[in-house]
């Protein structure tokens, strides 16, 4: 089959041409939009990149103030490397504005959407700059210390009281003391109280135990 042999011979050439056209030389120039904004603290460094698919592009950065429309864009010069990196070693308030890159390759010009650089004052660091895990461990240690301070003194007092009771015999029963409980009372006063209580017992009668016919109530 001569037709089949010719097709097999042309297959490597077709693969080579397809690979060459799929390479960077046959692709259209494309520039990534990039982040819409970048926030940097005052005095820190900032980096802006211009991502593109060019092989040897000519990258130029432009700058404009968003608040001043009448002020024309200012060219900042070429970027560094194939990504056209724009580097600020120390950012200040004058660096605020809109930055975009312009890529030229083979007379084809592309621009990025632009990135607005925000410069803010650094956030003051707290007095105790600790993570949440460290704070939780400190709170747990404080709880254990408070529990220790509450339980240990009370336990020591209980053991001390028990030791005193065992040493001086406070809790031991004393039969002699129970027998002489009323030793200090005056016997004359006791007999007088008994006479008075006995005299009051006959003043009132139990009405429930009396018969109706024999009921004779005493006059007050």
UniProtKB/Swiss-Prot annotation:
The chain crosses the membrane at residues 138-159. One of its GO terms (molecular function) is transmembrane signaling receptor activity. The modification Asymmetric dimethylarginine is found at residue 198. Disruption phenotype: Mice display impaired B-cell development which does not progress pass the progenitor stage. Phosphorylated on tyrosine, serine and threonine residues upon B-cell activation. Phosphorylation of tyrosine residues by Src-family kinases, including LYN, is an early and essential feature of the BCR signaling cascade. The phosphorylated tyrosines serve as docking sites for SH2-domain containing kinases, leading to their activation which in turn leads to phosphorylation of downstream targets. Phosphorylation of serine and threonine residues may prevent subsequent tyrosine phosphorylation. Glycans are attached at residues 58, 68. The modification Phosphotyrosine is found at residues 182, 193, 204. It holds the Pfam family ITAM. Disulfide bonds join 50-101. GO terms for cellular component: B cell receptor complex; external side of plasma membrane; IgM B cell receptor complex; membrane raft; multivesicular body; plasma membrane. Residues 171-199 form the ITAM domain. The record marks 204 as: Required for binding to BLNK. One of its GO terms (biological process) is adaptive immune response. Residues 29-117 form the Ig-like C2-type domain. Residues 1-28 form the signal peptide. Required in cooperation with CD79B for initiation of the signal transduction cascade activated by binding of antigen to the B-cell antigen receptor complex (BCR) which leads to internalization of the complex, trafficking to late endosomes and antigen presentation. Also required for BCR surface expression and for efficient differentiation of pro- and pre-B-cells. Stimulates SYK autophosphorylation and activation. Binds to BLNK, bringing BLNK into proximity with SYK and allowing SYK to phosphorylate BLNK. Also interacts with and increases activity of some Src-family tyrosine kinases. PANTHER family: B-CELL ANTIGEN RECEPTOR COMPLEX-ASSOCIATED PROTEIN, B-CELL ANTIGEN RECEPTOR COMPLEX-ASSOCIATED PROTEIN ALPHA CHAIN. This is B-cell antigen receptor complex-associated protein alpha chain. It comes from Mus musculus. The gene is Cd79a.
């Amino acid at each position: 089959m001569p037709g089949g042999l010719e097709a097999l011979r042309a297959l490597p050439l077709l693969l080579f041409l397809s690979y060459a056209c799929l390479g960077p030389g046959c692709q259209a120039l494309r520039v990534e939009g990039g982040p819409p904004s970048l926030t940097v603290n005052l005095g820190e460094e900032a980096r802006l990149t211009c991502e593109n698919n060019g092989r040897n592009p000519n990258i130029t950065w432009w700058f404009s103030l968003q608040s001043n429309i009448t002020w024309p864009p200012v060219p900042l010069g070429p970027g560094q490397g194939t990504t056209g990196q724009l580097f600020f070693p120390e950012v200040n308030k004058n660096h605020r504005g809109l930055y975009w890159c312009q890529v030229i390759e083979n007379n084809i010009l592309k621009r990025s959407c632009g990135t607005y650089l925000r410069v803010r004052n650094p956030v003051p660091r707290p007095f105790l700059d600790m993570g949440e895990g460290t704070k939780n461990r400190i709170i747990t240690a404080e709880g254990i210390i408070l529990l220790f301070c509450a339980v240990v003194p009370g336990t020591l007092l209980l053991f001390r009281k028990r030791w005193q009771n065992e040493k001086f015999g406070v809790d031991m029963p004393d039969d002699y003391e129970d027998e002489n409980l009323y030793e200090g009372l005056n016997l004359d006063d006791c007999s007088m109280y008994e006479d008075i209580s006995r005299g009051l017992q006959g003043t009132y009668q139990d009405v429930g135990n009396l018969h109706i016919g024999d009921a004779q109530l005493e006059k007050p």
